[in-house]
Amino acid sequence: MVSMRVKILFYSVMTFLLSCEERYFISLDPDVTDQLVINGFIDQSEGPYFIYVALTQGDWRPPLGIENAEVVIKDEAGQEESCAHMYEGKYSCAGDVVRGRLGVAYQIEVTYDNQLFTSSPDRMPLVEASSLMSWTEDQIITTSINGVDVMESSINFDLDVSVPNSEGVHFFQWRFEETYQVRETDFPDPFGTIPPPCYITKKTGSKQFELLFFNEFSSRQVTLDDAIVRLFDQSFLSKHIFIMYQHAISESYFNYLSQVKTLTESTGTLFDPPSGRVQGNINTIDATVQAIGFFGAIRVDTSYSVIYPNQINYTQKDGCLYDPSIADYQYEPYCADCIKLSGSLKEPPIYWSTVN
């Protein structure tokens, strides 16, 4: 193991919600159709906030976004604001009237097909955790498609969490993403044009997400070992950003996510009776019409860890680097058109140039 270990300071920023929305769809039963799915959250930012409304289709297909629902967000003071449909079932709540504030409870109302669906009020937590990401280079054993064990180089992140001494029980969730560049092959041309890079953002982490709670009997400091284990590849030949989203959540939201986590780690599906059903906080008057999902009020903090090529002991030839001895068709397809890669954009994310 390489002894290098780098500490990354934690700081709070308002979350860019379009990049961290999570829908938590889980192994939908192919025989269940036309069941409403409602997910979303409000955080302490100025908005907008996003709600997702969809119908299950069965046949293992993802839920189909609904365009004609009426979505309203409310706070405990009675203020309310309508949310506008954007695309594919995603609704945007501008935050002009209802704005996320710590300690305040929020809920949504969704009207669809003459049915009213209401979320139970969820209160935004006051307490935040202090989290510190640290990484080290490592060697891990993977198994090839031929069944042969292979030693490969990786970068492993630990997460050190501490919570202030305060009364009550506090609940947290962590999710991780990564962003990196992919550069297309710079084939010779008479104008000397250099193709712009693509920016890939995708989920990472050893698990779908991490959950912890703290009470007066538990330690206020915890280390999550190997929260991220990432094999080295060509994406580390340039700047590589790892992102941690920390959510302080309510007990109800924690219980919901715990069910989701259990289900994703088992062979059950979202609709297996009775233990396979995940109980969210979406309610309706008609007991024969049910919806799945959760609308939560969460405190969000985000931190970034940047890895540069000169910080790691990893070398590999860039497979997209132009080589006159290689025919055009011998390059990987993404070397000619990187936008075809999943999660790829030509524009860098807002944090790319500011995080160093």
Please describe what each predicted stretch is.
Residues 11-13, 283:
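A periodicity- and composition-biased signal for non-globular, repetitive helical segments
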Residues 1-3:
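Short, Lys/Arg-enriched N-terminal segments with co-localized hydrophobic residues
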Residues 16-19:
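C-terminal motif of bacterial Sec signal peptides marking the signal peptidase cleavage site
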Residues 5-11:
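Sec-dependent signal peptide recognition
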Residues 21-356:
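A sequence/structural signal for flexible, mid-protein segments enriched
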